[in-house]
Amino acid sequence: MKQLLDFLPLVIFFAVYKMYDIYIASGALIAATALQLIVTYALYKKIEKMHLITFVMVTFFGTLTLIFHDDAFIKWKVTVVYALFAIALAVSQLLNKPILKSMLGKELVVADKIWAHVTWYWVSFFVACGLVNIYVAFSLSQETWVNFKVFGLTALTLINTVITVVYLFKNMPEEHKKELNK
């Protein structure tokens, strides 16, 4: 259920964009992201920092898009969010308090060196996606950017998640692998 909620704003943005335009879709994205927070809190009594940061960025850039009637703001939102995620992961790793390990380390027991590899892998991924977003957003058509944002970045994120899980599992001690397979 939680993963479905993560996709709700993206699906609504895409559907509204296809029916109307980028401006109505931006407003719908703001509303859907707010709804996502409300439903998540109602169901789980907790809101993750990532969702809160995304909501603030969607609201900020979406509002600027609507006020100035300029889609450049909503296009920049993607890169800014990825940059913030990359910075947060990098800083947490440099401070020896890796975010990914704190989120997943209880379920996936691996050496700190492996968590560092995973962290830097995701930092690189977020930076690359942010840079590619700039290229697609400002060099190609708006429709191409929307499709890239919805399908391309989602697919890349899912692929990288699978790669990460495989890498973590491969580097997990045998006794922990057996526990997970029970």
Swiss-Prot record:
Keywords attached to this entry: Cell inner membrane, Cell membrane, Membrane, Transmembrane, Transmembrane helix
InterPro entries the UniProt entry points to: YciB
CC per GO annotation: plasma membrane
Major localization class: membrane
Superkingdom assignment: Bacteria
Location in the cell: Cell inner membrane
Membrane-spanning parts: 22-42, 50-70, 72-92, 118-138, 148-168
Keyword Cell membrane: yes
Membrane topology note: Multi-pass membrane protein
Keyword tRNA-binding recorded: no
Task of the protein: Plays a role in cell envelope biogenesis, maintenance of cell envelope integrity and membrane homeostasis.
NCBIfam families noted in UniProt: ispZ, PRK00259.1-2
Family: Belongs to the YciB family.
Protein name: Inner membrane-spanning protein YciB
Organism: Shewanella woodyi (strain ATCC 51908 / MS32)
Taxonomy of the source species: Bacteria, Pseudomonadati, Pseudomonadota, Gammaproteobacteria, Alteromonadales
